């Protein structure tokens, strides 16, 4: 745990009236916890959870087709990020050491086959405060990740291939 005993990790106090809204989902070998208020979802991911896979699973479980990922913070490891070059090809870079996730945003849509699809950009700070930012390909939670999602109840977004680039573009129904 990066030098911290697990019991030292602070847990956030929740007002009693909101505590009843918290849902704990046991999906196999891990527990994902979230709370929902209208269109807003706040999710907590725990050590070992991969961010993309967890958010896709949440979209499938809750059954939404369109959402904005408005913010995310935490501490992650085994990060793979990058950028799209001028030829439309992604260049990937690893950031394997535990790092602070200082900003995360993106969206959740569906593919043409109906699978949940996440598109996320983020910014990390390593332990020397060097910034690493770009398109997130993979990221595993090291301590915790707290992510806000705004579900667009009456919208539908579909990811479709774009010509000549390594990207699935958004189409709106």
Residue ranges and their predicted role:
Residues 11-118, 123-132, 136-173:
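N-terminal intrinsically disordered, cationic/polar leader segments
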């Amino acid at each position: 745990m990066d030098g911290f005993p697990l019991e030292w990790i602070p847990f956030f106090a929740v007002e009693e009236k909101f505590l009843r809204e918290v849902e704990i989902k046991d999906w196999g070998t891990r527990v994902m916890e979230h709370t929902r208020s209208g269109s807003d979802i706040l999710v907590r991911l725990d050590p070992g959870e991969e961010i993309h896979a967890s958010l896709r699973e949440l979209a499938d479980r809750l059954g939404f087709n369109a959402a904005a990922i408005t913010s995310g913070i935490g501490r992650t490891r085994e990060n793979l990020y990058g950028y799209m070059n001028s030829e439309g090809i992604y260049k990937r870079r690893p950031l394997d050491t535990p790092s602070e996730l200082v900003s995360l945003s993106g969206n959740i849509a569906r593919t043409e086959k109906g699978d949940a699809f996440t598109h996320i950009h983020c910014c990390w700070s390593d332990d020397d405060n060097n910034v690493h930012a770009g398109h997130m390909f993979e990221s595993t939670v090291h301590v915790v990740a707290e992510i806000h999602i705004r579900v667009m109840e009456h919208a539908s977004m579909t990811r479709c291939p774009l010509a000549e680039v390594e990207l699935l573009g958004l189409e709106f129904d």
